[in-house]
C-alpha cells in the first residue's frame, strides 16, 4: 500500500515517470523505501528547501499510522 502511494505521488511530480523505481526493504523496526528517480527529476522530488520530500514523508507518517509500521524514505539519484 505505502509503496504504491509514494509511487503515484512521485510519478505525478516528475517529467520521466517511467524512470521512477521504488525498492522496499523490510527491517526489524522499520520499512525502508528507496526511491530512485532520474537526475533531471531529482530537484522536483526534493523541492525547494526539501519541501516536497518533507511533504511526502509527512504523508507516509500519516498513512503508516493505520498499519502500525514505521517507514523511512530514502531518495536516490539515478
Label each PLM-derived region with a short phrase.
Residues 1-44, 53-78:
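RNA-contacting regions in translation and RNA-metabolism proteins
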Amino acid at each position: 500500500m505505502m509503496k504504491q502511494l509514494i509511487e503515484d505521488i512521485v510519478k505525478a511530480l516528475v517529467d520521466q515517470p517511467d524512470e521512477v523505481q521504488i525498492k522496499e526493504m523490510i527491517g526489524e523496526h522499520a520499512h525502508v523505501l528507496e526511491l530512485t528517480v532520474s537526475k533531471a527529476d531529482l530537484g522536483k522530488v526534493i523541492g525547494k528547501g526539501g519541501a516536497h520530500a518533507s511533504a511526502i514523508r509527512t504523508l507516509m507518517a500519516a498513512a503508516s499510522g493505520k498499519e502500525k509500521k514505521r517507514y523511512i524514505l530514502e531518495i536516490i539519484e539515478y
